[in-house]
């Protein structure tokens, strides 16, 4: 039986500023670095035989929490990347809430219906991310593996391998930053022990998705806004 820990990356700039990160390669915030310290302590005495990560910067930095105490190479896999958001890459949530609230609602609450020019669909992400996870599990029989990925990508891969509808946000939430999913893999099947455990974070380190304010960040021309 293979034991798998799937970890979402620490808080990055896009999380702090409520921006669609997608494949944009932003930095990890100071709070995110503290989350990584807490994550490292959580896994200090957990046996880890192999480590895989998305090749984006925020996941590679988060994966260093594992290499801090475990002498395992970090194996990068682009299939573990976050969903590509097409024309929404680097857009602020506040702008999207103002300009296209219906489409943003679809992205968050009706993911099986979401489509956007140039962006991946949830189904496409589920296929590539679950393919990577199945390959990792099959290549590591009877070992303990850590996999560092992204919020939507984790949600998509879990939907695929656990058979949970992608729209079931109650049983399939987007993990918190450095939130941990614990799976077991045996004879081609996955079972979940827990999803989104962030007990290693305390106080201000435990930033939950959706608990942040989304601001607009657009230039307003006073000549075009005479509503005062």
Regions found by a protein language model. Name each.
Residues 70-128, 184, 191-197, 219, ...:
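Phosphate-handling substructures
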Residues 2, 83-95, 143, 159-228:
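Acidic, low-complexity terminal tails and accessory targeting/binding regions
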Residues 4, 135, 143-149:
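Generic beta-sheet signal
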Residues 44-47, 136-143:
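Glycine-rich phosphate-binding loop signature in dinucleotide/nucleotide-binding domains
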Residues 7, 11-72, 76:
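Active-site-proximal alpha-helix that buttresses catalytic centers in soluble enzyme cores
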Residues 25, 29, 33, 56, ...:
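Amphipathic, non-transmembrane alpha-helical scaffold segments
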Residues 10, 151, 198:
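Active-site metal-binding loops of divalent metal-dependent hydrolases
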Residues 53-54, 127, 148-149:
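Short beta-strand scaffold positions
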